[in-house]
Design a protein with these regions (language model features):
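C-terminal-biased regions
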Residues: 1-130
Length: 130
């Protein structure tokens, strides 16, 4: 892994390398939303190559989530189907240059992130005995 060139990059790299799986999933959701919003902003600015790059980065995150989900449990099967849907919609948004589709997917990922964040808080409270 290449050394980070500035303090912010070093901080982010350290945060990712030391995050537990639950926190890492939340970071992935946050990153996906960031890139989806970036793609939408690029479309609004008529920066088609920028929108394409940002959309591909969001797709990469969704594919990673799809590949790592545990499909042995019912919730994993449901998440897998949702990730697959989001991926297909991102591809469609990229082809059609449609910001409405990007907004739809961003909303889905934000909902997942909110739910995941609540689950992490509950897990933390249970671990603390509360």
């Amino acid at each position: 892994m290449q050394a980070a060139s500035n303090p912010y990059q070093q901080y982010l790299q350290n945060a990712v390398l030391t995050a537990d799986p639950g926190r890492l999933t939340l970071m992935l959701y946050t990153g996906a939303v960031k890139f989806i919003r970036q793609a939408s902003d690029c479309l609004a600015a008529r920066d088609i190559p920028g929108a394409h790059r940002a959309n591909l980065r969001a797709q990469d995150i969704i594919v990673y989530l799809l590949e790592t989900v545990n499909r042995e449990m019912e919730v994993g099967k449901n998440l897998s189907a949702l990730y697959d849907y989001m991926y297909r919609r991102l591809v469609e948004a990229n082809v059609k240059k449609d910001p409405a589709i990007l907004e739809e997917v961003a909303g889905l990922v934000e909902d997942l992130a909110g739910t995941w964040e609540q689950a992490l808080k509950l897990k933390g409270q249970q671990a603390a005995g509360g």
